[in-house]
Amino acid sequence: MYGGRNFKTRQFNYATNSIRQAGSTMKPFVLAQFLNDGYSINSPYPGPAELIVNGEDFKNYGDTNYGQMTVGDATRLSVNTIYVQLMQLVKPDRVAKFAKAHGLAAELAGDATADKDPRPLESAPVLKPVLALSLGSGDVTTLQLASAFGTWANRGIHQTPHLVEKVLDAKGRVLEEHPGNPQGRQVIAQQHADTMNLVLRSAVENGTGNAARLYGREVAGKTGTTSDYTDARFVGYTSDLVTSVWLGFDNPKKKLVGVRGLAGVSGGSLPAQIWHDYMDLATRDRPNKPFVPPAELGGVVLNPTTTAPPTTVPQPTQPGPQNPPPTQPAPTQPGPSLPPTTLTLPGPGPDPTNPA
């Protein structure tokens, strides 16, 4: 874990305490609920450049109209307007609760029974159940995202992260030891987690996260970029190791503009490159274990190279605020190799039961 430059000058851990918006790293939790409700990644949806719902205006990055495409391809290309439609279908409050079961947030807005964060409520991560949550309006920490994405790598079993395994004295005697939970908790059915891994692999292999590809090793992940380039994320994983990267300034209004010569830092640029450089070393001596193919597709495999061609941009039918976080691919530029937030995943637990 890399939580800051110098603990002596500032006792603040950016990995565990910096609460910022998720950007499009929130989209996979909508997809997880979509799969949990019995829908297919091969379901077709229109991807207009602009979508207005109850006066709220949602747009794709670059005003791109993707035409009709599958949910799998919409995830790979991070299509905002399709994900707003998915959120309408599966409902924001259910997505917020499902994301919390995966390890996101300490509070659900309006939920008086939510677990309390030890920090003051005004500084606790909050997932507000609104349509914009599908595009990343929820508050998260970098460690929470690593923990939550690790649930899919672990085939649906969530493990609560901990930093200290055990404490030994000078003679090697155990003074304290984390009790752990080797079996974890099944929060999404195993077959749905396998499908999540397939879709998020396509996002790396042929989508917005392609800068994170590792030679000869399967990688799944998702990019995230918030409005006006104030936050950029990449969360990715192999079958047994997950790493979460966040870039941003202390001032949440300061933009990641002009960094390393980029007009704007997106999740697919520096965060994905940092992830790649770190994970290339971190996985070098680890077994190369592929993901388990999803059985639930019945032989239908997601085609990561097929998309519907863009069509003409539809005209909006009514005015509304323009505030969706942008999601975009980005050009590759060399980036620094900083140690991000990494979790080592335990082996899968017992056979899955119905997801919680």
Q: Where are each of the predicted segments found?
A:
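Glycine-rich, acidic and aromatic/proline-enriched surface loops and short helix-turn segments
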Residues: 1-5, 35-39, 47-50, 76-80, ...
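Conserved catalytic neighborhood of penicillin-recognizing serine enzymes
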Residues: 39-95, 130-133, 158, 170-202
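Surface-exposed patches in mature extracellular/periplasmic domains of secreted proteins
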Residues: 42-44, 107-127, 132-133, 159-165, ...
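Mid-domain, small-residue-enriched loop/turn segments at the edges of structured enzyme/sensor domains
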Residues: 56-63, 91-147, 163
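Proline/serine/threonine-rich low-complexity "mucin-like" segments in extracytoplasmic/periplasmic regions
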Residues: 295-356
